[in-house]
Amino acid sequence: MKSILTEYLEICVICGRQSEAEHHLVFGTYGRELSEKDGLKIPICNNCHNMGEVIRKIHGNPMAEKLSKIIGQLAWEKEYALQKADEFGRIINENEKEDSIKKIINTGARESLRKRYGCSFL
């Protein structure tokens, strides 16, 4: 599994137990395949994913589903901004890194996500 959100792929990001599944942060007909390519997945146990109580699982819980999509979008935008900053040599040193990322996100990352996934969650 590839994830741009965590390097700890064997641990459920919600509860800390052993992961048993992958949750695609942008899912549905328009997003699952792209989420796979882009690393917009998190390791998760079955209870936190889709088998536990409604208020403790992602699927079947509209608020949790929406938040997972927002988290996925923010992670994608940051990754996009870092790639663009490297491409254009905009990151000169660590002190300027955060400002550069914010500028790139504000000037294209969100629109690029909208074009890639067909929607935006923010």
Residue ranges of model-derived segments:
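Short recognition patches in nucleic-acid-associated and regulatory proteins
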Residues: 19-33
